[in-house]
Amino acid sequence: MLPWTVIGLALSLRLARSGAERGLPASALQGDLLFLLDSSASVSHYEFNRVREFLGRLAALLPVGPGALRASLVHVGSRPHTEFPFGQHSSGSAVQDAIRAAAQRMGDTNTGLALAYAKKQLFAKAAGARPGVPKVLVWVTDGGSSDPVGPPMQELKDLGVTVFIVSTGRGNLLELSAAASAPAEKHLHFVDVDDLHIITQALRGSILDAMWPQQLHASEVTSSGFRLAWPSLLTADSGYYVLELAPSTDPGAARRQQLPGNATGWAWTGLDSDTDYDVALVPESNVRLLRSQHLRVRTLPEETGPELIVVSHTRPRSLRVSWAPALGPDAALGYHVQVGPLRGGAAQSVEVPAGENSTTLQGLAPGTAYLVTVTAAFRSGRERALSAKACTPEGERSRAPRPQPQRTGGREP
């Protein structure tokens, strides 16, 4: 058990230092932190008091405030119980005092029930939770539970909640590793109840790291790619980046790109449409440690159209072409309409802006069969074309002279 504590401590301390190196004050952090405290009868009064003291000291070190980090405490027992909701206390010391005043609830260890309750609290406005901010759960346990923990914990993680677990008992390593967020060496601590102070700074650093604003973001998303951007974290001399991309359903098909330290963006192309991709930006530097950043991006559905070309208003030297516009979220940038004689000859083309789906073609020859092609150009760089045949009518025939009426009753000269 000791190696887990030492490894988690070393890594978390490095990550805690990296947070300060980013240049943003701790007050820039925003997030909702929920402490899940085993308050059941399986925990002795001595152990409960030691854990309560540990959580109080941890809270005192955090940047708690109305516009920063908010904390809440939920007891695990026969039924979950909220000691205080998010936003009730506006400083770390106030949260510490509230934790120290919490009384043990006793009862069964229904952790699964408490986790389902915690999910509602983390996303409920009535509980003081805020939308759009990072969510972190810190669960301190002696390792046992009277009901299943896996399914409700997975639901929390699927919603983006970062889960830290501190086990003070004989918990199952495999089960707790699966319950904590990955990687387990950062999010799971096995430590004796009298040695909890050893991981206080490490856990604080990991919590702040989990609540740091996401800096990697995607833009210009199309059906076949997207562009990534991030702030300058390194220089050309201080390190480099490794950018990783993989379909979320097939991590083995990962693509990697190494970029110089002064890079702040990259465009992925040639991707599958309507697909989730997991992206990781890994800064590599011997000067300072920076955590990797992760993002999931979904490409747009494949473009469709143009469709159903309609030829109308045919004249000997002109005709009108209409078409069903291209559909899909990746709208067409415009259309290229080309017309040329089927039996050979010079073709002409017309550019039609996006938002229009018809044009009149002029300067054609009477009585001629033409091939009309409408091509839609998309932001992704792809093009889709559709063709149809059209014929111009013959030109008007010359009229025959109108017959003159014959004279009657006269002489020929």
UniProtKB/Swiss-Prot annotation:
Instruction: Give the modified residues of type Phosphoserine.
Output: 72, 78, 91
Keywords attached to this Swiss-Prot or TrEMBL record, sorted alphabetically, are: Basement membrane, Disulfide bond, Extracellular matrix, Glycoprotein, Phosphoprotein, Repeat, Secreted, Signal
- Going by the entry's taxonomy, the superkingdom of the source organism is recorded as Eukaryota
Gene Ontology MF, one: structural constituent of ribosome
Q: Which InterPro entries has this protein been placed in? A: ECM_Assembly_Org, FN3_dom, FN3_sf, Ig-like_fold, Ribosomal_bS16_CS, VWF_A, vWFA_dom_sf
Region of interest (Disordered), residue spans: 385-413
Glycosylation (residues): 262
Predominant cellular place of this UniProt entry's protein: secreted
Compartments (UniProt record) = Secreted, Extracellular space, Extracellular matrix, Basement membrane
Annotated VWFA domain ranges read: 32-211
Output the PANTHER family linked to this UniProt entry: COLLAGEN ALPHA, VON WILLEBRAND FACTOR A DOMAIN-CONTAINING PROTEIN 1
Quaternary structure note: Homodimer or homomultimer; disulfide-linked. Interacts with HSPG2.
Its biological purpose: Promotes matrix assembly. Involved in the organization of skeletal muscles and in the formation of neuromuscular junctions.
Specify the protein name: von Willebrand factor A domain-containing protein 1
**Species whose genome carries this gene:** Bos taurus
Taxonomy-wise, where does this protein's organism fall, top ranks first?
Eukaryota, Metazoa, Chordata, Craniata, Vertebrata
